[in-house]
């Protein structure tokens, strides 16, 4: 309240001062008009004055109008002033002249009023010396006045700063030719403008200097280190740094769905296999067996491999899946996934480039997502009677982009169809039973190219079956007998060309053989018996119609080109250490083949020109099949004759 009362009092004082100023101004105006009227009466009209006298009277009248008396003596005549001839007068002390007359200006009188002492009036005193100006205050008559002195001013010229502006209008030059002097002037102006702009930029940079970052407390550091954003950032960054340390190529490649560039590098000519590289991690691969492998369709340089448990490390997870990268030379996996049961089968989820599916020894189906920074599965199936309760050796995603399912088969003969969006319960389930009483212990499964309904399976008894998912003949169909031991690998023909060979498939077994089959006949077309140990896996080339690869327990990789020879492999190589090779997988382009051994190592070989099909490979392979059928028919006839004899 005291502040408001003080403010009101201050406003009242200001209003009183304004009223006093107005009254003083009005009084002085009336006095001036009265003096003008008196002087007009005293003056006598002169008719024949000269122009000089007339101008003098006008000047005196003008001086009177502003409150200055014209009675002091005339000042010196005016001269043309320039900067060189300009002088300033300063105040010097002089004695007060009692005869001098004073006139106060209204503006000064009003501006000098202050406080409660009333208006303070300043007056101008004209001395007999016209170059001296005396200033006197009515309240300070005893003070000494100041005398004006002469001081010369030094002139300094500064060029005005040129402002250059541009517009988007069409500018047409007025003159097509300029003199050399004009051009030099323009260049000088441009250089000055450029220097000015550079100086301004430097000044701005100096002004915009960032303040030094403050030191984080220990609590803030721990909070950042354990935040989810930091973990995601760190997980991706360490992969980039590893690439940078091991590579000189584009380490910032992002897997965003772009087309794969053809792999650059030296391709070995001829039929010899050339070792490319080895994948092995001292922590995750040691003392583990490679149980399955798969190449990514979306990113052909990525390969996933599954491993069983490490008996020497009981505290480590039993099941491990590692994603390896062929594009970079780093020795660590791109992603590490694990679960609490040995992973017996694994594959990339087709149409879902970020998902990896695994089948475990316990019967669970697990799903990993590389977008999550977690290494454990993001989804898993329940261990219940509705799902699998036996080891799952077969996982496969079949269908199209808009309609696809995950097909899994366990060793108890149960086949389930799943949606990748929900693994809590299968969409369909079927018991693979032969003769409605004998469950099929499935060890391998394969779908023909372009078929999602019919498939073939291999069993522990050595028998091969055809099966169907839907229709009146759903379940086990035909029986193919020929192997004398468990079927370890089965694969359908994959190369697409002018002739359809999708009815062909090959199998491998513990009986040391690889057999060629057709779904049109329940007996093998041919048996390849060049191995001296268990044959653990077999796979057709994805691009060559007559080429397939197989691996055995002696660490040998064989490539068979049936157009060249059916008795011995076209190319063969034994890995270092002679460890048993468990799995073989072709890359999508058919130029590399990867094999996994019992020591947890993955070996990648370049196939070279052997894998490149010629235009006549399909017709040659068709003739080869005709010859194989003819030889089989002859052998069957000979066997029949011998039995009858």
Swiss-Prot record:
Changing residue 148 to G: Disrupts interaction with DYNLT1. Changing residue 155 to H/R/T/Y: No effect on interaction with DYNLT1. Changing residue 156 to G: Decreases interaction with DYNLT1. Its main location: cytoplasm. The modification Phosphothreonine is found at residues 105, 176. The modification N-acetylserine is found at residue 2. InterPro entries: DYNC1I1/DYNC1I2, Dynein_IC, WD40/YVTN_repeat-like_dom_sf, WD40_repeat_dom_sf, WD40_rpt. Residues 2-123 are annotated as: Interaction with DCTN1. Residues 147-163 are annotated as: Interaction with DYNLT1. WD repeats lie at residues 285-334, 338-378, 387-428, 437-477, 482-527, 530-570, 576-615. Changing residue 373 to L: Found in a renal cell carcinoma case; somatic mutation. The keyword Cytoplasm applies. Keywords: Acetylation, Centromere, Chromosome, Cytoplasm, Cytoskeleton, Dynein, Kinetochore, Microtubule, Motor protein, Phosphoprotein, Repeat, Transport, WD repeat. GO terms for molecular function: cytoskeletal motor activity; dynein heavy chain binding; dynein light chain binding; microtubule binding; microtubule motor activity; spectrin binding. GO terms for biological process: transport along microtubule; vesicle transport along microtubule. Residues 1-58, 96-125, 169-221 are annotated as: Disordered. It comes from the Eukaryota. Residues 96-107 have a biased composition (Low complexity). Residues 1-13, 20-58, 189-221 have a biased composition (Basic and acidic residues). One of its GO terms (cellular component) is cytoplasmic ribonucleoprotein granule. The modification Phosphoserine is found at residues 50, 100, 107, 111, 114, 179, 197, 635. It is found in: Cytoplasm; Chromosome, Centromere, Kinetochore; Cytoplasm, Cytoskeleton, Spindle pole. Homodimer. The cytoplasmic dynein 1 complex consists of two catalytic heavy chains (HCs) and a number of non-catalytic subunits presented by intermediate chains (ICs), light intermediate chains (LICs) and light chains (LCs); the composition seems to vary in respect to the IC, LIC and LC composition. The heavy chain homodimer serves as a scaffold for the probable homodimeric assembly of the respective non-catalytic subunits. The ICs and LICs bind directly to the HC dimer and the LCs assemble on the IC dimer. Interacts with DYNC1H1. Interacts with DYNLT1 and DYNLT3. Interacts with DCTN1. Belongs to the dynein intermediate chain family. Acts as one of several non-catalytic accessory components of the cytoplasmic dynein 1 complex that are thought to be involved in linking dynein to cargos and to adapter proteins that regulate dynein function. Cytoplasmic dynein 1 acts as a motor for the intracellular retrograde motility of vesicles and organelles along microtubules. The intermediate chains mediate the binding of dynein to dynactin via its 150 kDa component (p150-glued) DCTN1. May play a role in mediating the interaction of cytoplasmic dynein with membranous organelles and kinetochores. This is Cytoplasmic dynein 1 intermediate chain 1. It comes from Homo sapiens. The lineage of its organism: Eukaryota, Metazoa, Chordata, Craniata, Vertebrata. The gene is DYNC1I1.
């Amino acid at each position: 309240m005291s502040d408001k009362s003080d403010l009101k009092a201050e406003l009242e004082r200001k209003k009183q001062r304004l009223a006093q100023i107005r009254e003083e101004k009005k009084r002085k105006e009336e006095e001036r008009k009265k003096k003008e009227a008196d002087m007009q009466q005293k003056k006598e009209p002169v008719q024949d004055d000269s122009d000089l006298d007339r101008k003098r009277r006008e000047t005196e009248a003008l001086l009177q109008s502003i409150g200055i008396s014209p009675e002091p003596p005339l000042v010196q005549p005016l001269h043309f002033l320039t900067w060189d001839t300009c002088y300033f007068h300063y105040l010097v002390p002089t004695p007060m002249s009692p005869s001098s007359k004073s006139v106060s200006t209204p503006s000064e009188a009003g501006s000098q009023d202050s406080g409660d002492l009333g208006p303070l009036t300043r007056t101008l005193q004209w001395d007999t010396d016209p170059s001296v100006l005396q200033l006197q205050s009515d309240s300070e008559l005893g003070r000494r006045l100041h005398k004006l002195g002469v001081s010369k001013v030094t002139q300094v010229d500064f060029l005005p700063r040129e402002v250059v502006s541009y517009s988007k209008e069409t500018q047409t030059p007025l003159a097509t030719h300029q003199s050399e002097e004009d051009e030099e002037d323009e260049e000088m102006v441009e250089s000055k403008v450029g220097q000015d702009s550079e100086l301004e930029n430097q000044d701005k940079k100096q002004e915009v200097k960032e303040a030094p970052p403050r030191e984080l407390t220990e609590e803030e550091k721990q909070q950042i280190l354990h935040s989810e954003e930091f973990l995601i950032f760190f997980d991706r960054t360490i992969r980039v740094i590893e690439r940078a340390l091991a590579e000189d190529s584009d380490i910032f490649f992002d897997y965003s769905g772009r087309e794969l560039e053809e792999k650059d590098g030296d391709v070995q000519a001829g039929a010899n296999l050339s070792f490319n590289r080895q994948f092995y991690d001292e922590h995750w691969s040691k003392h583990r067996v490679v149980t399955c492998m798969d190449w990514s369709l979306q990113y052909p340089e990525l390969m996933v491999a599954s491993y069983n448990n490490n008996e020497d490390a009981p505290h480590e997870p039993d099941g491990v899946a590692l994603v390896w990268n062929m594009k970079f030379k780093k020795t660590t996996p791109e992603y590490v996934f694990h679960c609490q049961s040995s992973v017996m089968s694994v594959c990339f989820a087709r149409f879902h480039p970020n998902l990896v599916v695994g089948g475990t020894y316990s019967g669970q189906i697990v799903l990993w997502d590389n977008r999550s920074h977690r290494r454990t599965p993001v989804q898993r199936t329940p261990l219940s009677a509705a799902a699998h309760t036996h080891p799952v050796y077969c996982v496969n995603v079949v269908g199209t982009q808009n309609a696809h399912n995950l097909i899994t088969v366990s060793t108890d003969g149960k086949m389930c169809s799943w949606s990748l969006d929900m693994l809590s319960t299968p969409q369909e389930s079927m018991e693979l039973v032969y003769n409605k009483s004998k469950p099929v212990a499935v060890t391998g499964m394969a779908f023909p190219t372009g078929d999602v309904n019919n498939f073939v399976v291999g069993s522990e008894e050595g028998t091969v079956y055809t099966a169907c998912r839907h229709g009146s003949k759903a379940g086990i169909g035909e029986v193919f007998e020929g192997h004398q031991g468990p079927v370890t690998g089965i694969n359908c023909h994959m190369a697409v060309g002018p002739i359809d060979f999708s009815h062909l498939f090959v199998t491998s077994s513990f009986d040391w053989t690889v057999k060629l089959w057709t779904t049109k006949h329940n007996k093998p077309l041919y048996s390849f018996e060049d191995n001296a140990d268990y044959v653990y896996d077999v796979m057709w080339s994805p691009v060559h119609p007559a080429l397939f690869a197989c691996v055995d327990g002696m660490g040998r990789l064989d490539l068979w080109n049936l157009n060249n020879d059916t008795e011995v492999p076209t190319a063969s190589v034994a890995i270092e250490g002679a460890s048993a090779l468990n799995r073989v997988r072709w890359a999508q382009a058919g130029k590399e083949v990867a094999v996994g051994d019992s020591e947890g190592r993955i070996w990648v070989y370049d196939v070279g020109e052997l894998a490149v099909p010629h235009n006549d490979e399909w017709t040659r392979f068709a003739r080869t099949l005709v010859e194989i059928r003819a030889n089989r028919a002859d052998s069957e006839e000979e066997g029949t004759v011998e039995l009858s004899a």
